[in-house]
Amino acid sequence: MIMAERAVPPRVVAAERVASEAGFKKSCIPEVGRLLRLAAAAKPHGIIAESGTGSGVGTAWLHSGLGAGARLVTVERDEELARRAASIFADDKRVSVLTGDWRLLEQHAPFDVFFCDGGGKRDDPQGVVEQLAPGGLLILDDFTPSPHWPPRFEGEVDELRLFYLTHPALDATEILTTPASSAVVAARRL
């Protein structure tokens, strides 16, 4: 059986172009992007958030699953990247690109989907959890798979990953996105 190549949404292509032009090398990978699209699509009237817009690749994947009644708010601390990412979504009033610290998102919380790829993930994990609505989905990528429990990174217990996987307010799991990378996906308990 021959598999057709999966189409990449046009705004993702535009954001990848911005990343290339800006020399930005930390965009989310397509495997995570498809997960983001699925999460956004699961909350068609939700408030979707992203910390760490970068060039807008993750934002574009979230946008590709955005329902007509949903809103998407993302924040990037680099002014130039935020400006360029905002231009990709300038024609869609459902999307807001903020410039500054990740805490700017708090005024838009609680979130039905939160892709935490920037501020908050490491420096305020409890604050990240508190931004989720009951039943809200949290996606954190850029982990290295670990066959051990508790999970390890570079020979040590990965306290950050362990925090999210065992948090009492979350039902969480780790999924393999590529052979060399994984993501933590969690839902806030009702």
Question: Where in the sequence are the language-model features?
Answer:
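Rossmann-like AdoMet
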Residues: 1-28, 41-42
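Generic detector of well-ordered alpha-helical packing
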Residues: 51, 77, 118, 142-143
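C-terminal substrate-binding/active-site "lid" region of AdoMet-derived donor-dependent transferases
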Residues: 122-190
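SAM cofactor-binding core of SAM-dependent methyltransferases
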Residues: 24-104
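Structural motif corresponding to alpha-helix initiation and N-cap regions
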Residues: 99, 121-122
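Hydrophobic beta-strand segment of the Class I
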Residues: 48, 114-117
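A short acidic, Gly/Pro-enriched loop at the edge of an enzyme's catalytic core
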Residues: 107-114
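Conserved glycine-rich SAM-binding loop
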Residues: 54, 120-121
